[in-house]
């Protein structure tokens, strides 16, 4: 494997692509596990819903800060190093988040995971688009489908470990190991084009997907409409994942373990939608699919 896959509508599923998919899915594992654990963490810390919601605020704020820094970090360090540092920061954040040291520690851990996670997602997405060429949109949808599958499993795992008295932290501790193992596997890929893993080659045409060149012209109006739609979808998704378990405990009388596991209904729907979306992305234009 010495060059990018031949451009086409169907993604080229080689080893580095699968590793990248898996790394994105591991972040999704935490993301949806984060929502499932919020009510459990609030019970443990004895805080109100208002105080517990600080975790969501910190997560969002850290996302914004990291998102502003990522382009410069990719320019300076390259994609490979950004992914490596992101995995390290995320693993450290999970360890701090799950440490029984009270609210300050869980907030700090949340910020670290958010910074590492958004850095991992942005950099891995840029790599996939660059590496897969015209199959990039379909590849991203495939990656999101696999991530949704992990998101479907994590509430069930957290609910099961809570019911078995193993504690909700067990699944997140296993996630740390999985993150480090996948990064070790990625770093040991001898035939991966280093320029594409580190910093994409500067193309002659700035319109190439995932390129490292910069076009400082204003974004078209269609971009801002698309960004607005994605923002609304993300707001809906985070509202469901963060508060569904707590709402089911209050309104439906579910126990902590059952409420955490029930979040799988939300993430399972996302998984089915992304499976269908990955097929449609191979046949329809991206703007039509978004509509």
Which residues are covered by each model-predicted region?
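Residue-level signature of mid-helix packing/kink "hotspots" within the transmembrane helices
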Residues: 32, 59-68, 152, 267-271, ...
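Hydrophobic core of transmembrane alpha-helices in multi-pass small-molecule transporters
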Residues: 105-119
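Pair of pore-lining "gating" transmembrane helices in MFS-fold secondary transporters
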Residues: 10-37, 111, 220-236
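Extracytoplasmic gate region of multi-pass secondary transporters
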Residues: 34-35, 221-264, 271
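Helix-breaking motifs and short loop linkers at transmembrane-helix boundaries and internal kinks
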Residues: 46, 78, 99-104, 133, ...
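Helix-loop-helix hairpin linking two adjacent transmembrane segments in secondary transporters
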Residues: 134-135, 142-191
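Conserved MFS/SLC helix-loop-helix module at the cytosolic interface between two early adjacent transmembrane helices
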Residues: 65-104
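Intracellular juxtamembrane helix-capping segments at the cytosolic ends
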Residues: 119-132
